[in-house]
Regions:
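Aromatic-lined, polymer-binding surfaces characteristic
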Residues: 1-162
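Extended polysaccharide-engagement surfaces of secreted carbohydrate-active enzymes
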Residues: 122-333
C-alpha cells in the first residue's frame, strides 16, 4: 500500500460507523467485505499480518509504522462486528503496538532507538507528534471498544508530556517549539496530550501546555472547532500559570538538550541538537537555537522545508552537517 493511501482506512471507518445504524445486516456485511478487500487487507497485509507482510518496525522513518498499521487498526475495529478477520487484525495491531515504542534501533543503518529514556522521539517534534498521535488514536479507539478491559501498559507514555513541555517556548503570541529537523516552530503537540489525557494519563503540566496553544496556530491541531478538539479538549480553566518542571533537560539518547532562564513567557531559552541523523531528523547535527524576548534570535541553520531545492541538494549531503563539512574540507586540502 502506498503510504499516502493509509488515510483511506480511518476515513472509511468514520463513514462506515456514521451510517451503520441505518444499514440492514446484509448491507453492513457487503460494505464491510468490500472495505476489507480494498482497504484493510492491503494495509494490514503490508504492515502487520503474515504471510503477506513486507514491512517491519524498521521500515522508512520511525513514524510510518503507526501511521499505516494503526490507521488500518482503526478500520479493523470498525468492521469487527461483521468480520472475525477484522477483529483478529485489530488484535494483531494492538499486540504489536508496544513493540513500536520499544524499538531499539538498527546498528547497521545507524538508526537510533525510537524513544529516549527521558521521553520523547527524536525525529523532529512535527513527526514525533504525528507518529505518536496515530498510535494513540488507535489505542484510544481500542479502549473505547473494549470498555472495562485494562489496556496493555506502555511505559513511554508516562514521559511524553515532559518531553513536549521541555521543547516548547512560551511567549507572547503563539506557542513556539524547537524546530530541529523537518518541523516548524509553530507546530505543537496538543493532539498527543489530549489523547493521553483522555486515556487517564494526566498531569497539570499538560493543561498548562494545551492552554498555551492558540486556536488554529498550525495545520493539524486538535482545535476546539474541529471534531477531535471538540471531543477531547479538557477543562483548561484549572491550568496552572506555570509548569512544575525543571528549567533544563538533556535527552542523551538522541542528543537534544534545552535550558532556559525561566518558564515565564518571553524568557531566554537555548536548544541544542548534536546527535543521530535519520529521515526527518536530517543532517543538521551540531545545530542550536536561541529564543529571547519571544523571538528566535539565532535560528537552526539546518532547518529547511521540502519545496526548497537545498533540502535534497544540500541537506542530504555530508556537507549539510557542519562538523563533517569541516572534516571534508580539511581532507580535500
Amino acid at each position: 500500500m502506498n503510504p499516502s493511501g493509509f488515510y483511506v482506512d480511518p476515513l472509511s471507518a468514520i463513514a462506515y460507523d456514521t451510517v451503520y445504524n441505518d444499514l440492514s445486516s446484509s448491507e453492513r456485511k457487503e460494505i464491510a467485505e468490500g472495505l476489507k478487500r480494498l482497504a484493510l487487507d492491503p494495509c494490514l497485509g503490508d504492515w502487520v499480518l503474515e504471510p503477506a507482510r513486507i514491512h517491519s518496525l524498521n521500515s522508512m522513518g520511525h513514524n510510518w509504522w503507526t501511521s499505516c498499521a494503526c490507521m488500518g487498526g482503526i478500520l479493523a475495529l470498525s468492521l469487527q462486528n461483521e468480520l472475525p478477520e477484522a477483529k483478529q487484525g485489530a488484535e494483531a495491531v494492538y499486540e504489536a503496538l508496544p513493540q513500536w515504542f520499544d524499538f531499539a534501533g538498527d546498528v547497521l543503518q545507524q538508526k537510533p532507538k525510537s524513544f529516549d529514556a527521558d521521553g520523547g522521539m527524536y525525529e523532529s517534534l512535527n513527526y514525533a507528534n504525528f507518529g505518536i498521535q496515530e498510535a494513540l488514536q488507535f489505542r484510544l479507539a481500542w479502549m473505547n471498544t473494549h470498555l472495562g478491559q485494562k489496556p496493555v501498559q506502555i511505559p513511554q507514555l508516562d514521559k511524553l508530556s515532559d518531553f513536549f513541555v521541555h521543547v516548547c517556548y512560551p511567549r507572547t503570541g503563539i506557542l513556539y517549539n524547537m524546530n530541529f529537523g523537518d518541523s516548524h516552530k509553530n507546530v505543537t503537540a496538543e493532539s498527543t496530550l489530549m489523547l493521553l489525557y483522555a486515556m487517564g494519563i494526566r498531569n497539570d503540566n499538560m493543561l498548562w501546555y494545551m492552554n498555551q496553544v492558540e486556536q488554529g496556530q498550525h495545520r493539524d491541531g486538535y482545535f476546539i472547532d474541529r471534531p477531535m478538539g471538540f471531543l477531547y479538549t479538557p477543562d483548561l480553566s484549572k491550568a496552572p500559570q506555570l509548569p512544575e518542571i525543571k528549567k533544563s533537560q538533556l535527552f542523551a539518547d538522541f542528543g537534544w538538550a534545552t535550558m532556559r532562564t525561566s518558564w515565564e513567557k518571553d524568557a531566554t531559552m537555548l536548544a541544542v541538537k548534536s546527535g543521530h541523523t535519520w529521515n526527518h531528523s536530517h543532517a543538521d547535527a551540531n545545530s542550536f537555537i536561541i529564543f529571547h524576548k519571544g523571538v528566535d534570535i539565532i535560528k537552526d541553520a539546518g532547518n529547511c522545508w521540502y519545496p526548497n531545492p537545498s533540502y535534497r541538494n544540500y541537506f542530504f549531503s555530508k556537507r549539510g552537517t557542519q562538523c563533517r563539512a569541516f572534516q571534508w574540507q580539511r581532507t580535500v586540502a
